[in-house]
Regions:
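Glycine/proline-enriched, intrinsically flexible loops and inter-domain linkers
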Residues: 1-207
Length: 207
């Protein structure tokens, strides 16, 4: 009953912030991607015949604030003690290939836009493996503040030879060599009216 309780703690923190935001708009930024997006990929490594377990969070976008855009590619509010595995370490230690690692530029518009989330792809380079994940904010996007727009949702996609499945959670789902896992973390909510955004900042966003 307490598994993945960090997701509940994160949402409680966010609930308080959202309730206070209309009354403290100069101190509280818009909503962020919120979820730790707990990621566990494991199995028996073909190279060593030893068990392997990749366990990490995913980073995402934070909400815009009164005087700045949201931060991009940071871990969630209740996740200060775990780390994203560097690409080189992940590929050396585990039977995976990191095929993509980039910003997800879908974030909430505003005078100060939300920060960007991330897209990270893992290609399974092992005869088989299993994946267990949890990502909240799959249905409800990060909220905008002071007339800012909503951010984007967290998504986990698994591509097999004949199918693509997108969910918020996977539990011991079987994978085979060549299957691809895509983690898409959401962008933060925007702060302030988007039409008040500085023209130079809009141009920078577009380029």
């Amino acid at each position: 009953p307490v598994s993945c309780n960090w997701e509940a703690f994160s949402h409680l923190t966010d609930l308080v912030a959202k309730a206070l935001a209309p009354h403290m708009s100069d101190k509280i930024s818009a909503g962020h991607f919120l979820s730790i997006i707990g990621t566990i990929v494991g199995g028996i490594d073909d190279r060593t015949q030893e068990p392997f377990v990749l366990c990490e969070p995913q980073a995402g976008g934070w909400g815009g604030g009164i005087n700045k855009d949201g931060e991009s590619g940071l871990v969630a509010i209740d996740d200060g003690d775990t780390y994203i595995i560097p690409v080189e370490v992940a590929e050396n230690k585990y039977p995976i290939i990191v095929e993509q690692y980039k910003f997800n530029t879908s974030s909430g518009a505003g005078k100060h836009r939300g920060g960007y989330g991330l897209v990270r792809d893992y290609r399974i380079d092992n005869s088989n493996a299993e994946i267990t994940t949890i990502a909240s904010r799959y249905r409800v996007a990060p909220w905008g503040a002071n007339d800012g727009k909503e951010g984007s949702n967290n998504k986990i996609q698994v591509y097999t030879q004949n199918n693509m499945e997108e969910k918020a959670t996977f539990s011991n789902d079987k994978l085979q060599k060549g299957d691809l896992i895509r983690f898409i973390s959401g962008g933060g909510g925007g702060y302030g009216n988007p039409y008040e955004r500085d023209v130079d900042m809009v141009l920078e966003d577009a380029l």
